[in-house]
Amino acid sequence: MSGRGKQGGKARAKAKTRSSRAGLQFPVGRVHRLLRKGNYSERVGAGAPVYLAAVLEYLTAEILELAGNAARDNKKTRIIPRHLQLAIRNDEELNKLLGRVTIAQGGVLPNIQAVLLPKKTETHHKAKGK
C-alpha cells in the first residue's frame, strides 16, 4: 500500500531544559528571561544565564549548608531565619558579601565586650597559699 501513515518522519526528541543540560537545579530559562526584561543590556548571551544560575545555586547551597549546621547545633530540625543569620554572620566571606543585608527575625550575634567580663584575679589564689 502507499506508505502514508505513522511511519515516515522523525520523532521529535524529548525537550531537555537548559538547567538539566548544565546540571543545575536553578532555572536557567527564568534567569535568561529576567536578564532580558530587566533592561541590563540590549542583548544577553547564551552563557550568561547559565553562569548566573550556577553562581546563585552555589551561594544558596553554601548558605543552606551553614544554616543547617547552625540548626543542628541548636538541636533543631527546621532552619529558621535565626539560623540563616548565625550562618551568614559567623562566616567571614558571606558576612562581607551580605554585610548591609537585614534578615527579618534574625536577631543579633551574641557578643560581650572583654572589658565587661569579670576579671580573673590572681591575688585570691596567692592569699590562700600564704
Curated annotation (Swiss-Prot):
Post-translational modification Symmetric dimethylarginine, affected residues: R4
GO CC annotation terms, alphabetical: nucleosome; nucleus
Annotated positions of the N6-(beta-hydroxybutyryl)lysine modification: K6, K37, K120, K126
Pfam hit, one: Histone_H2A_C
Residues annotated with N5-methylglutamine modification: Q105
PROSITE patterns with a match to the protein in the record: HISTONE_H2A
Cross-link (Glycyl lysine isopeptide (Lys-Gly) (interchain with G-Cter in ubiquitin)): K14, K16, K120
Residues bearing the modification N6-acetyllysine: K6, K10
Modified residues annotated as Phosphothreonine in this record: T121
Keyword Acetylation: yes
Gene Ontology molecular function terms on file: DNA binding; protein heterodimerization activity; structural constituent of chromatin
Modified residues (N6-crotonyllysine): K37, K119, K120, K126
Principal location class: nucleus
Skewed-composition ranges (Basic residues): 7-19
Post-translational modification: Deiminated on Arg-4 in granulocytes upon calcium entry. Monoubiquitination of Lys-120 (H2AK119Ub) by RING1, TRIM37 and RNF2/RING2 complex gives a specific tag for epigenetic transcriptional repression and participates in X chromosome inactivation of female mammals. It is involved in the initiation of both imprinted and random X inactivation. Ubiquitinated H2A is enriched in inactive X chromosome chromatin. Ubiquitination of H2A functions downstream of methylation of 'Lys-27' of histone H3 (H3K27me). H2AK119Ub by RNF2/RING2 can also be induced by ultraviolet and may be involved in DNA repair.
Subcellular localization: Nucleus; Chromosome
Span list, region Disordered: 1-22
Residues modified to N6-lactoyllysine: K10
Modified residues (N6-glutaryllysine): K96, K119, K120, K126
Residue positions where N-acetylserine is found in the record: S2
PTM sites of type N6-(2-hydroxyisobutyryl)lysine: K6, K10, K37, K75, K76, K96, K119
Matching PANTHER family: HISTONE H2A
Membership in a protein family: Belongs to the histone H2A family.
Subunit structure of this chain's protein: The nucleosome is a histone octamer containing two molecules each of H2A, H2B, H3 and H4 assembled in one H3-H4 heterotetramer and two H2A-H2B heterodimers. The octamer wraps approximately 147 bp of DNA.
Role played: Core component of nucleosome. Nucleosomes wrap and compact DNA into chromatin, limiting DNA accessibility to the cellular machineries which require DNA as a template. Histones thereby play a central role in transcription regulation, DNA repair, DNA replication and chromosomal stability. DNA accessibility is regulated via a complex set of post-translational modifications of histones, also called histone code, and nucleosome remodeling.
Protein name: Histone H2A type 1-K
Originating organism: Mus musculus (Mouse)
Name of the coding gene: H2ac15
